[in-house]
């Protein structure tokens, strides 16, 4: 079976949508701030973003369901921005980018360090895993047409993970 190379159709790949939503610096920095517990407009300004850009990026993240905008219970004139389940699902991508930056950018580990709450040990590097849990290298991977995949066995749940095409 030959590796799938063409077409790189943007309609069969989740990457263009992800880039439409998150594909610029401020969106990722706002997401990082939200993961660090910031919830208010004034707090987000602390990352060095201009007010107009902040308002625009927050609106976009809310529009795409990454953040939810909620009035504060104690003062209905103020709002909070909180991560949704869709936003929390971006954590592995955020961590992979952070780890890449640590390795190839600054050359030093970031601080603070993200640890496992249970044993307070640093998390492992983000990796690509096979269905059976094996860590895969780039050389272990192959793009194939989704129609070539075997259907799930009887009683086995269908794979609801990423598509097997990309752009």
Where are these regions (language model features)?
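C-terminal regulatory/oligomerization modules of transcriptional regulators
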Residues: 95, 99-167
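N-terminal helix-turn-helix DNA-binding core of bacterial DNA-binding proteins
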Residues: 13-52
């Amino acid at each position: 079976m030959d590796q799938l190379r063409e077409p790189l159709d943007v309609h069969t790949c989740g990457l263009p949508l992800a880039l439409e939503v998150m594909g610029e610096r401020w969106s990722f920095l706002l997401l990082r701030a939200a993961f660090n517990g910031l919830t208010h407009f004034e707090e987000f300004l602390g990352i060095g973003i201009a007010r107009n850009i902040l308002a625009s990026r927050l609106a976009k993240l809310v529009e795409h369901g990454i953040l939810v905008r909620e009035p504060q219970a104690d003062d209905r004139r103020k709002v909070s921005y909180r991560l949704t389940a869709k936003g929390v699902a971006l954590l592995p991508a955020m961590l992979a980018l952070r780890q890449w930056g640590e390795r190839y950018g600054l050359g030093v580990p970031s601080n603070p360090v993200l640890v496992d709450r249970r044993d307070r040990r640093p998390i492992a590097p983000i990796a690509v895993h096979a269905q059976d849990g094996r860590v895969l290298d780039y050389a272990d991977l192959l793009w194939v047409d989704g129609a070539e995949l075997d259907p799930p066995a009887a009683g086995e749940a269908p794979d609801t993970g990423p598509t097997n095409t990309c752009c």
